[in-house]
């Protein structure tokens, strides 16, 4: 059925059960990932952006109500990021995009504590999330082009998304959002599809 969600198992068996509950609603994930593509990312509801740490490609949000902190890594946007995609394809993290993301991640963990942070990323941002953090992670439609498994990761993907076809080999917890075939490949890759989870607690 269109929009149905499906939880997959993997070869790791019991290890998949060790993946922690993330403590974040899917609607919040959708909006924060979408906002990461804005030219000037801004606050979202109770999530206030930490301007002292945030940049254009990675943002740090603090929820003063819950105490939760979100670090969001943006996906591909522009020719420069396409070059980064190509570098990641060969397992090369020696680039300014990665260095800046790692710096922001380290500063956020030093300021707020790693246990209080959920790191999220869409597409290329998901790959970066895997590489800069070993804490709680939520990745969405992340292309898996090298070994980037993490037992603390919730990997969400949309069926028929051409950019994350081989992410089924990932460890951790998985959610697949069932989606019909679309002639526009970017439709199934879009963060809009997360809305089909109906504000599920992740």
Describe these PLM feature segments.
Residues 120-125, 129:
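Gly/Ala-rich beta-loop-alpha elbow adjacent to hydrolase catalytic centers
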Residues 15-16, 21-118, 136, 148-152, ...:
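A conserved cap/lid and substrate-binding interface adjacent to the catalytic center
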Residues 73-76, 122-123, 140-143, 159:
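Active-site-proximal beta-strand/loop segments in catalytic clefts of secreted hydrolases
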Residues 5, 11, 15, 65-68, ...:
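Serine hydrolase/lipase
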Residues 105, 129-130:
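Short amphipathic alpha-helical segments and helix-helix/interface helices
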């Amino acid at each position: 059925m269109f929009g149905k969600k499906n939880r997959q198992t993997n070869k790791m068996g019991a290890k998949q059960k060790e993946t922690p509950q993330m403590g974040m609603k899917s609607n919040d994930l959708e909006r924060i990932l979408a906002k990461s593509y804005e030219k000037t990312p801004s606050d979202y509801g109770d999530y206030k952006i930490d301007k002292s740490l945030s940049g254009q490609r990675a943002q740090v949000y603090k929820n003063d109500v819950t105490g939760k902190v979100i670090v969001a890594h943006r996906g591909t946007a522009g020719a420069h990021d396409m070059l980064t995609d190509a570098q990641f394809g060969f397992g090369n993290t020696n680039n300014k995009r990665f260095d800046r993301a790692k710096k922001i991640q380290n500063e956020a963990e030093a300021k707020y504590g790693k246990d209080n942070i959920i790191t999220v990323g869409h597409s290329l941002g998901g790959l970066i999330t895997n590489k800069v953090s070993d804490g709680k992670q939520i990745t969405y439609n992340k292309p898996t082009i090298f070994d980037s498994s993490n037992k603390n990761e919730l990997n969400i993907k949309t069926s028929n998304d051409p950019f994350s076809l081989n992410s089924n080999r990932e460890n951790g917890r998985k959610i697949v959002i069932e989606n019909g075939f679309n002639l526009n490949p970017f439709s199934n890759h879009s963060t809009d599809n997360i809305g089909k989870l109906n504000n599920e607690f992740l």
